[in-house]
């Protein structure tokens, strides 16, 4: 449900984080909210009523580390997991600073260098 997805509290928190990056835009794809830069997806919000989640790109090795350290929160998402993407469940108490850090890293990996360089240093 497209309109239902937009009402999710987790998406209301995630959207402004994702749209804060240079040239980032949101678009609904496959019934889910996706966030892109230059038409490449760097973050997706999965609007599952019981278990909303975000999927984003992660550097090599990060997926194993995150999922291994906290499998209740992090998981290997379908379709894109084999590319190293990581999923984070947003149904528990969410550390939105951690979300912002994950999404920022994903944006840096996805955006053209010129745009990524406009972000403040970590």
PLM segments and residue spans:
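Charge-dense, helix-prone N-terminal extensions
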Residues: 1-122
């Amino acid at each position: 449900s497209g309109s239902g997805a937009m009402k999710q509290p987790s998406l209301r928190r995630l959207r402004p984080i994702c749209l804060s990056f240079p040239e980032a835009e949101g678009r609904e794809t496959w019934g889910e909210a996706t966030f892109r830069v230059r038409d490449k997806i760097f973050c997706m919000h999965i609007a599952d009523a019981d278990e909303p989640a975000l999927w984003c790109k992660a550097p090599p090795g990060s997926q194993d580390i995150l999922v291994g350290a906290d499998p209740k929160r992090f998981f290997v998402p379908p379709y894109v997991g084999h590319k190293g993407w990581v999923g984070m469940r947003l149904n528990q108490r969410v550390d939105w600073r951690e979300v912002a850090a994950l999404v920022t890293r994903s944006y840096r990996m996805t955006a053209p260098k010129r745009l990524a360089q406009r972000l403040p240093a970590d």
